[in-house]
Structure formats: structure tokens, C-alpha cells
Amino acid sequence: MRKINFSAGPSTLPLEILEQAQKEFCDYQGKGYSIMEISHRTKVFEEVHFGAQEKAKKLYGLNDDYEVLFLQGGASLQFAMIPMNLALNGVCEYVNTGVWTKKAIKEAQILGVNVKIVVSSEESNFDHIPRVEFSDNADYAYICSNNTIYGTQYQNYPKTKAPLIVDASSDFFSRKVDFSNIALFYGGVQKNAGISGLSCIFIRKDMLERSKNKQIPSMLNYLTHAENQSLFNTPPTFAIYMFNLEMDWLLNQGGLDKVHEKNSQKATMLYKCIDLSDGFYKGHADKKDRSLMNVSFNIAKNKDLEPLFVKEAEEAGMIGLKGHRILGGIRASIYNALNLDQVKILCEFMKEFQGKYA
């Protein structure tokens, strides 16, 4: 029996995708070999590779103003690649909303970029998304769309004249996005759109001009990968194959509007369970900034019960509920592949647990 996986990433995958990958693992579409065994220069793999890029653009409704890059190194490598490629001689402005923005800020500072932290929610342990106004003439404005540890999420992105950079690793492909002022939109795909080992970057083509005439190693230059269609070196072929299956699955769900509708239903159910617990459970995030992806909460009446909650949940078939080591508590990551019935099972367990230990 499969466990219900609430892990923050790598995370649960749709069963039908796992079954299709299993079916094709040794014999891809009757060709007599695995997709993992063939060259990335073959027609067979190119169909997967370019098909995945086109489907990703279709889901977000993007035209040819954007390039889709498949890169390695995780989203963490982008913390350095972004300032390397996109910083000019001005100020690069960051909003600090958690661990991942702190890491991005640190990498930019290591590179000697003129970093300005325009606002931070660190004083309140990152429990909300601070309101912000960026400078019109900043080299770029940087935000993290969703914060996995603290359970906060931008409901709408800030409107900026400066190019907006968005780390969307933990809410990738979970909802439609207004790209009107987004210059670069990126994430690792292992939470909502595949397996670990692949990052997907949507970059507006005019931003690639910033990489020209810069002394950047070839592998770290966006232009290198754009000019070579993300085939400059051997890409993570199996991760791209899995990403392609995920794109098909998302399209078959009815696209990102339908996916967002389901995600909203799941989150509403879980937050209602927390809010109606008479203070037994308490969410970390400010209600107006609650994440649809990561629900971080505590057993407010007795935090010593939290390890027991995780243990008993696992015995009941639910894994991945232990909170991040920085924040502690309990965290349920309810990404695209989790369905409403699975979240309902968690809510029923929470009510039973409260009944036993309140």
C-alpha cells in the first residue's frame, strides 16, 4: 500500500506517471531501449526535450518572448547565476522572506554585487510576506514566491518597473502567473513538476543581452544554454523525461487554472481543520499570506506532542510531516500530486489526535 507523502521535496508524484515510467523504463515506446540509455542528440530524445519545453510554455501561456532553459545544479545554483548574468552596475534589490532568499542574498554578496534588502520579515520569524516597493531603476527586483519552511506565499506578485526575478521552486506549475513584469521565473522541479536533478528557467529573451561580453564561465552563462537549446552539455535526460510526463499530466488535468482550483480546495480544508481546533493547532503564517503548498503548524497546547503526532501519522500511513529543522513543528506539503481525499485523511487524523490528547 502506497503511503500518503507530505514531504516538502522531493515529493509525491502522480501514480499514473510512476506507472508509465515503470512501463517504459526498459523499453521506451517499443523501441527496445530505455530513455536513459540513448544519446541526447537523437531524434527520439529531442522530441521529449523540445516537447517538454513547449508544453511548459503552453501551461503558462507564454509566447516566444521567453526562452525555456533546462539546467542542472538545482535552484540553488541560480542564486549565483542570476547576479552573475543579470547584475549591471546598479543596485540589485531583494525581499527577504526566509531561508532561500537569505541564501540568494548571500551568493549575490559573495560576487560583490550591490545588494539592497528592501524589506524583511525576519523579525517576526518570517511569518508573513512584507509589502514592498522596489526602485524603478534597480538592476532587478528579487522575490521568492513561496516559502516552504514558513508556509507563506505571495498571493500576487509586486508590480515593478525593474525586471522581476521570481524563485518559484515550491509553487511551480501550481497556478497561473501574470508574467507582464517578470524577467526570469525559475525553480527546481522536484516539488511540483518532476524529480530532482533538473531546474527549469523561463527567461525573457531581452535579458539574455546582459550576459553578452561578461566574463562568465560558459556553463554559468544563460546565453550559452539559450544558444544551444539547453543541450550545450549532456542534460539530465531522465529528469527531463519525467518532467515531460508531468507536463502532459498537468495539461490533462485541465491546465493551471484547474490545478489551482484543486490546490485551493485542499489548502482550505487543512487550514479550516487548524482554525477550528480551539487553539490545539496553530498555523505559523499570517492568514493573509498562507501558502497553498506548505502548511506549517504547531500543537500550540503542548509542543511536546509533536514528535508523537509525526510517529502516529506515519503508523497511519502518512509520511513527511515533520517540520523543517529550522522551524520545527509539523509541516504538510500539499503539492499538485496530492488529492483532496488524501488531505481529508490527514484532517481526520488531526481531529482524532486532538480528541485523544487535548
UniProtKB/Swiss-Prot annotation:
Enzyme Commission numbers on file: 2.6.1.52
Enzyme class, spelled out: transferase
Major subcellular site: cytoplasm
Binding positions (L-glutamate): 41
Any one GO biological process: L-serine biosynthetic process
Modified positions (N6-(pyridoxal phosphate)lysine) in chain numbering: 191
Function: Catalyzes the reversible conversion of 3-phosphohydroxypyruvate to phosphoserine and of 3-hydroxy-2-oxo-4-phosphonooxybutanoate to phosphohydroxythreonine.
Name this protein carries in UniProt: Phosphoserine aminotransferase
Lineage: Bacteria, Pseudomonadati, Campylobacterota, Epsilonproteobacteria, Campylobacterales
